Design a protein with these regions (language model features):
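C-terminal catalytic subdomain
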Residues: 210-275, 281
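Glycine/threonine-rich beta-strand-loop-alpha-helix active-site module
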Residues: 27-34, 38-131
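C-terminal charged capping/lid subdomain of soluble metabolic enzymes
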Residues: 253, 260-336
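Short beta->alpha junction loops
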Residues: 16-26
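Flexible, glycine/charged-enriched surface loops at secondary-structure junctions
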Residues: 160-168, 183-195, 210-215, 267-273, ...
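Carboxylate- and glycine-rich phosphate/diphosphate-binding segment that chelates Mg2+/Mn2+
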Residues: 102-210
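Single conserved hydrophobic/aromatic residue that forms the stacking wall/gate
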Residues: 1-8, 12
Length: 336
């Protein structure tokens, strides 16, 4: 939603852009930017899920960087110019985009996702209203919630943490395990909806500082190649990547298992980590999230591997570095 103030009064006029699609494209962004510029808008309200917020972020970046095409913004610190006043109103509990410095957009010609990271992309204001999420269908509730869980887990197990990111990530994990199945089965439970919104926010705060990992690197590129919803891709991929990390992530995953109250006395760190991964698989199964991605095609695997590693290495501070063979193995495990 784009706003324009009237100089003659205190009334605000608005221009609405509602063409954003899941995995927003360059065209979506340029259309939104054109609407903003042509109507002399002065502020932006991003209302919706992660796709809407990411589209709005990059449209705002294009407003202040009119001579910089979107591909040139890819990576870190490529905007570096203050955005117009920016308000984020999430209607899903998952992406945490209302508090992150990141936006992800799709090049429709190459089917490649571009991650754009810059502190100026963090919205100035965020409104967390659980009433806006009560109408979400169960499958959106579940996959966006697992998206938030992925943010918290990848932030916590990485090597770029602070005390604050650790606390926010653990808090988010506990809140999600305590509430996600409740909101999946009873979408009108306003208290649980509020907890999920806060969990998504805390996870967003955590990964904005501590980054994510290979789950996101692979999910972004599956989304770009096949249009798979980001939360769904993360939910399916998460346990496979955690298994790949093995011993390098056991201690951290054990701590998250304790935060989620799924451990038993006498368990080793390895057993706690395995219990945590099993609990993620169980959540997926209980919420009818598949454990394979049918769209993956054999001919696309080399491109998926190349693009995932290009995104992940060396930016993401992961517990264990993937090489091409490792990444291919994980992607093949995702195939039916």
């Amino acid at each position: 939603t784009l706003m324009r103030s009237s100089a003659a009064s205190d009334v605000y006029k608005r221009q609405l852009y509602d063409g954003t699609q899941p995995n927003p494209t360059f065209d979506n962004i340029e259309d939104a930017r054109s609407l903003y510029v042509e109507n002399n808008c002065e502020a932006i309200i991003a209302f919706g899920g992660g796709s809407s917020m990411d589209c709005a972020k990059v449209a705002a970046a294009r407003v202040v960087r009119p001579n910089t095409p979107i591909p040139k913004m890819r990576g870190v610190l490529k905007v570096l110019r203050k955005l117009p006043p920016f308000f984020a109103v999430p209607t899903t509990a998952g992406t945490g985009s209302e508090t992150t410095i990141a936006a992800v957009v799709t090049n429709p010609k190459t089917h490649e996702k571009y991650a754009i990271n810059d502190p100026v992309l963090r919205p100035k204001y965020a409104v967390l209203d659980p009433e806006l999420t009560v109408g979400l269908p169960p499958h959106i509730t579940s996959t966006t919630g697992m998206d938030a869980l992925t943010h918290a887990v990848e932030a916590y197990i990485g090597h770029s943490n602070t005390r604050d990111t650790e606390e926010n990530a653990k808090r988010a994990v506990k809140m999600i395990f305590d509430n996600i199945e409740t909101v999946y089965r009873d979408g009108k439970n306003i208290e649980a909806r509020g907890e999920m919104l806060l969990a998504s926010y805390y996870a967003g705060v955590a990964f904005t500082r501590a980054y994510v990992g290979y789950v996101h690197a692979i999910a972004h590129n599956l989304g770009g190649m096949y249009g798979i919803a980001h939360g769904l891709a993360n939910a399916i991929i998460l346990p496979y990547v955690l298994e790949y990390y093995g011993e390098s992530a056991h201690k951290r995953l054990a701590e998250l298992a304790e935060a989620a109250s799924i451990t038993q006395p006498g368990m080793t760190d390895a057993q706690k980590a395995e219990a945590f991964i099993a609990a993620i698989r169980r959540l997926n199964q209980d919420m009818n999230i598949p454990d394979k991605i049918e769209q993956i095609q054999e001919k696309d695997i080399p491109t998926l591997v190349e693009r995932a590693l290009k995104e992940g290495n060396p930016l993401y501070p992961v517990p264990k570095i993937m090489n091409e063979a490792d990444c291919e193995m994980v992607i093949r495990r995702l195939m039916p």
